[in-house]
Amino acid sequence: MNLTKKIWCTIFALIVLLPYLHADTIKMMQYNMMYYTTAVPSGCTVTSSYLNDKDINLKKIIKYVQPDIFSVNEIGSQSTYVDRIKNNVLNTDGVTYYQNCPLTNFSGGSIANMVYYDSRKLGFHSFFYITTTVRDINAYKMYYKTPQLLSGDTIFITFIVTHLKAGSYDSDQTTRAQQTAALMTKLQQIGVADNYVFSGDFNLYSSSETAYQNLINYSNTLYRFYDPINQPGNWNNASQFANIHTQSTHTSSSGGCFSTGGMDDRFDFILVSPYIYFGSKKVKSVNESYHALGQDGNRYNGEINNPANTSIPDSIANALYNFSDHLPVILEFAIDNTVSIADFEEPFLVQVYNPIENMLTIEFQLNEADQYTLEVYSMDGKRLLMHKNYFETGNSVFKLPFELPASLYIIKIQNSKKQTVVKKAIKF
């Protein structure tokens, strides 16, 4: 191997492996806990052991998943319920490291949102909330406890939790749209496009709903949210989405508390900002990790534990069935804590998709319009393709004919200021 090839192989190895050599992973679980309160609505009949039974089932789920971030809906809006989960479920059997964020309930009501976190990995920084006609939208800014923390260098992630208005009437859809519009306006007012995670029970029936479009097609592309599994459609009662439905775990309900009808809705979501989706500020969503716990694709209009679940143990399937009519949604995040943030922050957002049918697709998120030069290199350092193109501010998708053999390639993208982003592409 000549010197040039050795150099390029070394560069390629650094590009591909360096951000992950010492990467940590944060596992998030989002869960609508279904009335974790004694203030249940009329028609829901509970026994004196109601919360004790819920604690037993939730503890099984927590021990099985072991989340670092646990965001919840439908927790009682008093601190006693927040403390109860922390003390009776999370910090048990020798575990002492779970903490909770501040509770708010300025919108009023008997249920609220909450975020619990593993204090060995994360610390609480600050929070804000948005009042709505239904429930607060809660945002908690967390910092990752990097080895460089004492020198003031860390990674921030803001976890935003909501429980949007339920119902299928036009008025319900309008309220949901108002809620998500309020969030996007708030983020724009803050003025920092950053690492945001937005999760909760969205109560959406379709990706065409205005509430959802407010998130994924917001006018300022730097604040848009991305669905890690990119599954748009009419989710309600559609068998083609059976593997992502999150509600209901029950087909019938003897006590009147659980929604019925079986698994036929995608109500529960974890969405991420472009900075997390593209991994540009040291945090990247591991999109293939996204799943609803217990959703093996065989639950359409059925129950989570009958017939036997193929993705989780029977004990966990039964705990999910007994605890809530929703399934928890799980997503992992890769944290690059190798060097200081400034060293590896990319000057502009780029996502390179592996070539399909001799076409290379590149997606840009740009703060300013400019001319960009795209170059494709082989592993031995030979430039194979070069193309120049002018892109406007915002989101752009560029497709380049890619009639090259199956191999690994290095993609170099540079603007007129000589700011450069280097990616890899694999053609199979």
Model-found features: residue ranges?
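Non-cytosolic beta-sheet module surface loops
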Residues: E74, V82, T131, N354, ...
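C-terminal tail/sorting-segment detector
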Residues: F391-T393, L404-F428
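Bacterial Sec-dependent N-terminal signal peptides
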Residues: M1-T25
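Short, glycine-anchored, charge-dense loop/turn motifs used at functional sites
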Residues: V376-L384, Y409
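Exposed aromatic-hydrophobic patches
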Residues: S396-F402
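Divalent cation-coordinating acidic motifs and surrounding scaffolds
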Residues: D24-N337
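Residue-level detector of functionally pivotal "anchor" positions at catalytic/ligand-binding pockets or at interdomain
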Residues: I335-I356, Q365-N367, K382-L384
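Short beta-strand/loop motifs in extracellular/secreted proteins, especially
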Residues: D194, D370-T373, Y409
